[in-house]
Amino acid sequence: MSLLARHRMRAVLGPLLLGASLAAGAQEPAAVPPQRALRLTQAPLQLDGRLDEAFWAQAPVHAQFYEFEPQAGRAAPWRTEVRLVVDDQALIFGIRAFDPAPQQIRATRVRRDQVKRDQDFIAIFLDPSGRQRHAQFVRVGAAGSLADGSYSAQDDNEDFSPDFGVQAAVQRLADGYSVELRWPLAQLRYP
């Protein structure tokens, strides 16, 4: 299994609503047009890792991602789809990670903030200022373990001491896994 399978992490989704954007570990070869989220007006989502609620089918699909490792900027060889919805309280991500060898997914249950690069995980880096200097991040391992913290681009450092009240659930599938992740808006830190 290549590093990419284990590191579906630093890719740009483009500017998101309210000026928030995902920080990138790799530069995009071409500009990505602004992307949008679906406004959720129904009852709060019950996180179960399944993307079977009707609103997920209505949310825009973001699927243009690039490698960070082993070759920064190369188009990702395996498909990952991200959908974003927002309600009054949170950003809610629905992620579908396809894998041609799902039996090789490294889904290790670990303590909080112990999701490391030797495991399969999805990571989201949010850069509320849009300056690409600092970001808040969350990693969700394929077994459902969480790690969160802050990232500094200046020294390429990840600090796992902050906790952002993020909730997530994972569902293993025949061809990969899916993740539902709820990130409270109140936890986004603006400089």
Where are these regions (language model features)?
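Bacterial N-terminal signal peptides that target proteins for export
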Residues: 2-13
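Structural preference for beta-rich elements and adjacent junctions enriched in aromatics
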Residues: 26-191
